[in-house]
């Protein structure tokens, strides 16, 4: 059974365990694994305003995804940056795609108009995923990070998810969104995965 739900504080160590494997690759530009305390602080900071989701398979967390503000200044409030990390054993099974669909549907309720994703150029799997989801390349940051003895380019993907009204409604915090609407979106997307036997999907 697959379950997609909002994050809880008690998930922090399981999520950090997944993230730590990526810290040792160019996929994450963080060079040292953060402490449990620091990681929990990040979860709390992000999840108070934006969707932060986890995916469980038979009760075990196998991935997580969240949205966060794209930039700090007020005029950027209608954009959000998306991040997804999946346990390597579950890559390529549709979980990342399902996370994105759930996040985007929630972000629409929050009046987000554009979503972004920053992807290390060498991460070809993520490149293919974003293109298949209708993201386009907004630009490339050349040699923007140095890690593991190499300079790395970063691709900025973008996707429009709302109308650019002349006078847009302000961004709504996740706290302003009805909990049942979020639960329903998570359930709709987890049902898609439950109709596929991901344990036997290549």
Predicted features along the sequence, with ranges:
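Conserved catalytic-core motifs of GNAT/GCN5-like acyltransferases
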Residues: 116-119, 136-153, 162-163, 168
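Conserved GNAT acetyl-CoA-binding A-motif
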Residues: 107-119
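Acetyl-CoA-dependent GNAT
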Residues: 31-89, 100, 160-162, 200-201
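Helix-loop element at the rim of GNAT/NAT acetyltransferase active sites that forms part
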Residues: 17-33
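Conserved acetyl-CoA-binding loop-helix of GNAT-fold acetyltransferases
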Residues: 92-105, 128-132
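Conserved beta-strand-loop-alpha-helix junction that forms the acyl-donor binding cleft
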Residues: 91, 117-127
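A short beta-loop-alpha structural element at the N-terminal edge
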Residues: 3-15
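Glycine-rich phosphate/pyrophosphate-binding loop shared by adenosine-nucleotide-utilizing enzymes
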Residues: 2, 60-64, 152
